[in-house]
């Protein structure tokens, strides 16, 4: 055991939150990778392996629908300092649940670090927003609806689906990471 590293949390039991645009910028500008910004088919990339992280698919014909009680979220900017609590919080609500992610106010993700998750087939969006605002001091930024899905074929020869290209269950799941840990 490395005496300088103390981590009692197994990787499949913890999660990490990060701002996607900041991570992407950091990786692309690191100089560690040859970056070609273009709209390409992963099959045309000259590499031994390609990790397809292009986000949510436009066509869901190659995906299985996953059952989940929520299918929508209202994203908001908090009117308080979320950094006073250094871990994410999950609060049960009348319509589903709310997540609060401690996010630095300068981060592009700060405007969306509080999310009210609910089922739009049961609760109308205006009612969900009313309930959200009655429980939390936030400025609503946007409403999103989403599908819960997993790829039927996550690995196709040398192309490996990852992130939202592989799987989406709900806003706070790091689903693809956990899925690969379980498959391994």
Language-model regions: role of each:
Residues 12, 85, 169-172:
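Residue-level detector of alpha-helix boundaries and kinks
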């Amino acid at each position: 055991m490395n005496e300088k590293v103390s981590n009692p949390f197994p990787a499949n039991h913890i999660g990490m939150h990060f701002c996607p645009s900041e991570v992407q910028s950091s990786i692309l500008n690191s100089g560690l990778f040859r970056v070609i910004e273009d709209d390409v088919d992963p099959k045309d990339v000259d590499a031994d392996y390609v990790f397809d992280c292009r986000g949510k698919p436009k066509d869901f014909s190659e995906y299985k629908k996953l059952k989940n009680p929520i299918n929508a979220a209202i994203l908001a900017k908090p009117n308080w300092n979320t950094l006073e609590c250094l871990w994410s919080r999950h609060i049960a609500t009348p319509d589903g649940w709310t997540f609060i992610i401690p996010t630095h106010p300068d981060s592009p993700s700060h405007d969306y670090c509080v999310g009210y998750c609910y089922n739009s087939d049961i609760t109308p969006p205006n009612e969900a927003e009313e309930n959200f605002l009655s429980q939390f001091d936030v400025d609503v930024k946007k409403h999103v609806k989403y599908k819960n899905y997993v790829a039927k074929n996550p690995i196709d020869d040398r192309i490996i689906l990852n992130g939202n290209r592989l799987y989406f269950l709900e806003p706070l799941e790091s689903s693809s990471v956990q899925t690969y840990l379980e498959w391994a």
